[in-house]
């Protein structure tokens, strides 16, 4: 984990004698939007919260299920813009940092944790597999990533995709961990999500503007249509990170990236998105602070008390929104204070 003064892409390029490359602020905005989604989903106030902010029980797709794939895709988008992404030491240090930080967060929430689980452990596993994929020649990268999805489909056909028995349950048990949406069985599919982000990052790096917008939009639409066409055979399932889930959520993320790139980077509409940009730049701080303070510390004491009082005064629906909205506001204030001081925390 590194704490460093904030620097623009132009400053960093100048420091190494490269032509300045403008920062694509739309990417930070999309990351920030994903962070807001995670905070709203993780810190929901009570059962009166809309169903779309609850994950699908098993098969199916809700807004809550799209949030994390968007975040993972943005992780991949950043790779082509990083001078250190290819370096083994830098990549492995990042993976280790994410895994350790994830272990600490899960331990703070539940009192114990297994290495490699939790949201940050999931990011670490997906990033590692994607980084290994990127060691291959570029044509082989695409072929291999495309081959992962049919492979996952075959596993589902052989071992099943039921809530009590699936190939994911079997793999996690063999690895000695409990089945969960963030357990190791989800790493291959989510690595493909990260790789889709890498491809999008290459498109943006090769030249932002109309051509990039067309490619991102066409690619996103094609993924959504293909994924939906597969759902009668391969159901949408976040907990298994099924092939159809990879395609549909990856397509949605690409379409969102195209829209924000057009608005923020091409049209220059920045001010309305500045709050999201702050959370996108300080994403690690936002997530860890929320998990520790609002999930580990306050959720068992303060949150129930506030929920009961607000429910009695304004009703359950108002109380359901108070806690998640308050968590976003407080987390944003912390991130904004750090950014004003030029402090950016990255892993």
Which sequence ranges carry the predicted segments?
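Alpha-helical transmembrane segments and their immediate juxtamembrane cytosolic regions
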Residues: 1-347
